[in-house]
Amino acid sequence: MTQPPHPSRSASHLLPRGEKDGLSRRFMLGAPLALAACDRFATAQPAPGPLAAPLKDIVPAPFGTIGMTWQLDQQDWIEQVRRHCTQMTPEWEQKMERTLGPGFTYDFSASDRVVGFARDNGLRVHGHTLIWYSQGGEVFNDAVVPRARFATEYERYIRAFAGRYRGQMAGWDVVNEPVSEDGTGLRECHWSRALGMDGYMVRAFQIAKEADPDTVLFLNEYNLENIPQKGATFLKLVERLLKLGAPIEGIGTQSHLSIEIPDGNIRTFFRDAASLGLPIHVSELDFSLFRDGGRMPDLRSLKEKRAQQVARVGELAEAFHALPERQRYAFTTWGLRDQDSWLTREEGRNRPDDSPVLLDREGRGNPAYQAVVNAFTGRAGA
């Protein structure tokens, strides 16, 4: 399988979601518009100085970002990763689209490169992802594959991939995005049709644990804060799968935030999630200034959008900080600098004026960065 094109030429395969329609579900609003100008985070200002203080020294847990093979020879990116990060998640290199070929053949070479880079730079690695309904697995969709072989190849793939990095991964997203878009139920997919709605997840976790007993196994999902019903459905799923024997050991909340969700949604989800007692990973944090990534009309001023963004990111950081220390697995942004985010590089969207992560293009902290600093250092509202 060839190396993916650089995002400036093609990015359809880089989408962290399996978006096939014109709407970005990351920005579905699960509640009415809530302006945050009066929120105590809304007055946060950009961090002073030419470079932001290292996030790894501020976040009360491992701070991580994503990496792709084409970034591994970019010295400016490498310097920022070394400055800020203690963890790395492969953005695309461990998705089945890249690792599984015709005839159930494997190619883990791109994954090996990112894992090797992380190891060489003293970063721990969070694996992403073993089983997902999107971006790969077409060989399993072949109608001529007998069910018995389907189950055999499913287990063989998980065992081979997780076992390849036995003892090297801090954690794995074993199953990614099992809940339906609106949060009312579970997502039907080729895995559930062949192996059962709960069965495919239980078996994936069991095989992953056999292959790598010491890694922390996560169920990962998006829009858990944006859509309260989805958060509730997800947590009930975790409880049910645990009772069925799935060794789920962590909760991943992607936190692709709509900055317009009401004050309190994020705190409520984190409180409810913490009650399960499992480690929590803020696994894919970003927060576009634009509705639906710029596809929807938006008359708000930049000042209004920044105020909402700062308020929501600050709320998230406070909610994470409030967790017991043993439940703070990691805090990961989906891109380290604005230019690294899929939201600014996606073909057809490409909003260079967006600011969806914590560092700007020069590595300086933006207002959301300062909100995170304030939350983690107890200076919110100061």
Task: Map each language-model feature to its residues.
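Aromatic-rich peripheral "rim/lid" segments of glycoside hydrolase catalytic domains that contact
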Residues: 173, 177-194, 265-272, 285-382
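Secretory targeting signals
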Residues: 1-9, 16, 21-23
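Conserved, mostly hydrophobic/aromatic
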Residues: 88, 118, 172, 251, ...
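Acidic-and-aromatic substrate-binding clefts and catalytic sites of carbohydrate-active enzymes
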Residues: 66-77, 96-109, 179-181, 224-233, ...
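Glycoside hydrolase catalytic-domain groove-lining segments
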Residues: 198-203, 212-216, 231-233, 240-296, ...
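C-terminal segment of N-terminal export signals and the immediately downstream linker at the start
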Residues: 21-22, 39-66
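N-terminal secretory signal peptides and thylakoid transit peptides that target proteins
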Residues: 21-39
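Substrate-binding cleft and catalytic face of glycoside hydrolase catalytic domains
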Residues: 89-93, 99, 113-194, 198-216, ...
